[in-house]
């Protein structure tokens, strides 16, 4: 009961507070999707997106509770950078592929691009990150899909990287006129308010179930421009969250998006 009250109190403080500066020096150029009520998507990334049965499962859980038509494919490579992915191949019809059924030439409404955690801030990797982000954004658009660039989170033992990652990724999303999804900023906001709610695995890098839940809530809220607050969906992979923790993360996700994009709460 005590933990429940503490969680509720922390969440109420966040919701009642005025807009506070998120940990980034770069404002987004694109603040909402052009596609309305997307029904199909693809996630391209690495284990950050695949942990805990995959972020796609969390988004599907929110969509199912909300009664929305939504399906998505996830393609991840362990420790994969954006350069590891052949997006053009992923968007080529393959035999028995349901996304290209009946000659469908626009299989996905949105494509989420999630790079390796260090490539946007590692001096040796930054040029490759920029090159392939640009290439993948162009490839996504050529297929009729809207690209979404995922802003990843800092390692648990390097919270100072939150701003570095956000600034680098958002700047490149802006350079390509693509929308950035500030997942890493939401991680930072959650950890400020609820340091007891662990978002990183013991390796201090990959997400716990709570981290994946927050990631999924961010994706869902961006796709449909809707707050997930109040959803009963507890999570995936036999790792359900406590109701008070799920509510807190729902609130963090929506507040972060509203503060970042300038949306009305």
Language-model features, listed with the residues they occupy:
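Alpha-helical cap/lid subdomain in secreted, periplasmic
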Residues: 99-209, 221
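Conserved SGNH/GDSL esterase-like catalytic core that processes O-acyl groups on lipids
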Residues: 40-42, 49-127
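Short hydrophobic segments within beta-strands
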Residues: 44-45, 150
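Boundary at the C-terminal end of the N-terminal hydrophobic targeting segment
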Residues: 19-21
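Conserved catalytic region of serine esterases and O-acyltransferases that act on ester linkages
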Residues: 206, 216-265
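N-terminal low-complexity, Pro/Thr/Ser-rich intrinsically disordered segments
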Residues: 23-40
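Positively charged n-region of N-terminal signal peptides that target proteins for export
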Residues: 1-4
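Bacterial N-terminal signal peptides
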Residues: 8-16
């Amino acid at each position: 009961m005590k933990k429940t009250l503490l969680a509720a109190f922390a969440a109420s403080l966040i919701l009642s507070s005025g807009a506070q500066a998120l940990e980034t020096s770069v404002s987004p150029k694109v603040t909402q999707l052009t596609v309305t009520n997307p029904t199909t998507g693809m996630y391209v990334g690495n284990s950050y997106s695949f942990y805990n049965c995959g972020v796609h499962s969390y988004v599907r859980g929110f969509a199912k509770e909300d009664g929305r038509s939504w399906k998505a494919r996830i393609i991840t490579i362990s420790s994969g950078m954006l350069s590891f992915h052949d997006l053009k191949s992923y968007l080529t019809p393959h035999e028995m592929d349901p996304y290209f059924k009946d000659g469908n030439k626009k299989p996905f409404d949105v494509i989420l691009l999630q790079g390796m955690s260090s490539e946007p801030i590692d001096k040796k990797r930054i040029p490759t990150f920029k090159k392939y982000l640009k290439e993948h954004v162009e490839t996504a658009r050529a297929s009729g899909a809207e690209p979404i660039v995922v802003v990843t989170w800092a390692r648990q033992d390097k919270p100072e990287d939150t701003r570095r990652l956000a600034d680098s990724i958002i700047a490149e999303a802006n350079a390509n006129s693509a929308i950035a999804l500030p997942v890493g900023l939401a991680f930072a906001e959650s950890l400020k308010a609820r340091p007891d709610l662990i978002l990183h695995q013991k390796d201090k890098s990959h997400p716990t179930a709570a981290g994946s839940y927050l990631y999924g809530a961010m994706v869902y809220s961006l796709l449909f421009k809707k707050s997930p607050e109040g959803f009963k969906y507890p999570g995936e992979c036999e790792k359900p969250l406590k109701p008070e923790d799920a509510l807190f993360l729902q609130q963090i996700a929506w507040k972060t998006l509203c503060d970042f994009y300038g949306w009305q709460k």
